[in-house]
């Protein structure tokens, strides 16, 4: 019985790609929130690669396919997988972000709509990313010119996505897009469509606003006031490993080490044993 249930949870990813060097390594990452972990590697032989996995407990794995080769952009292909799905990946060049994913998974089909909407621009964006990677030793002026070009392309893609999002119902993929747009608003000076993004954010119900993505979007759209030297430190409900709540105000007058880190930060995780000793 267990073999049958295992087979029912299994999905396959079959790749057929042209214009890619034989012997190129491909890695499959499983994304959990902001953290990605490698769950498989394969080598492209005669233009093919293959992965087989059991879906996680949530019933939907969010994956990304990546090649670290210098012919490739430092980007990855987004894949959504569910139990029993037979997924086919095809490409004609190393522009991996726009390789085609033929899949029965609803989230994948929705994601594909966004890609197709800006395929020409994404291809150009990837070519620039490859060029920028090979220009590490170039002058700052040349690199800045490339970045300005990338920012302009990115801004047009964002505007196209905004237009598409107005027509689509809210879903997980839609929320991911809104999060990406809110980050662009924060970091890309060429992207200035704040009113339109706020209008999309206003479509969210309370539960969606309270989700992890919803909270991140809110912080990007309404940046919190930063604390200056000499001000009272910003405070919040901080939970220890036993789930007990603490506040920074409880430690007033004492020395304190605050370690800020990103959820998927490798060096931070490696430093944990030392932090515990302190």
How should each PLM-predicted stretch be described?
Residues 215-248:
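N-terminal "domain-start" segment that seeds a small globular fold
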Residues 147-149, 185-194:
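Short coil/turn connectors between adjacent alpha-helices in alpha-solenoid helical repeat scaffolds
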Residues 7-152, 156-159:
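A non-transmembrane, solvent-exposed segment enriched in polar/low-complexity residues
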Residues 252-277:
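Conserved redox-active cysteine motifs that mediate thiol-disulfide chemistry
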Residues 1-7:
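Hydrophobic h-region of N-terminal signal peptides that target proteins for export
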Residues 192-204, 231-237:
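Alpha-helical repeat scaffolds
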Residues 167-185, 215:
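Amphipathic alpha-helical repeat scaffolds of TPR domains
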């Amino acid at each position: 019985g267990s073999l049958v249930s295992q087979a029912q949870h299994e999905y396959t990813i079959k790749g057929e790609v042209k214009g890619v060097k034989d012997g190129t390594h491909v890695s499959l990452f499983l994304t959990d929130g902001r953290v990605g972990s490698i769950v498989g590697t394969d080598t492209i032989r005669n233009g093919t690669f293959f992965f087989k996995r059991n879906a996680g407990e949530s019933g939907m794995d969010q994956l990304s396919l990546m090649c670290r080769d210098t012919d490739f952009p430092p980007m990855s292909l987004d894949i959504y997988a569910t139990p029993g799905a037979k997924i086919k990946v095809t490409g004609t060049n190393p522009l991996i972000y726009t390789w085609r994913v033929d899949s029965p998974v609803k989230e994948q089909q929705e994601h594909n709509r966004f890609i197709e909407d800006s395929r020409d621009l994404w291809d150009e964006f990837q070519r620039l990313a490859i060029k920028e990677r090979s220009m590490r030793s170039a002058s700052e002026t040349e690199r800045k010119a490339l970045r300005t070009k990338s920012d302009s392309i990115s801004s047009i893609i964002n505007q196209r996505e905004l237009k598409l999002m107005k027509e689509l119902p809210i879903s997980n993929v839609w929320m991911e897009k809104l999060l990406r747009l809110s980050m662009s608003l924060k970091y890309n000076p060429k992207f200035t469509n704040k009113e339109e993004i706020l209008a999309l954010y206003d479509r969210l119900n309370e539960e969606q606003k309270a989700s992890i993505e919803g909270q991140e979007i809110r912080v990007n759209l309404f940046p919190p006031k930063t604390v200056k030297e000499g001000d009272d430190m910003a405070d919040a409900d901080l939970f220890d490993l036993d789930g007990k709540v603490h506040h920074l105000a409880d430690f007033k007058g004492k020395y304190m080490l605050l370690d800020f880190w990103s959820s998927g930060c490798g060096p931070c995780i490696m430093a944990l044993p030392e932090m515990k000793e302190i």
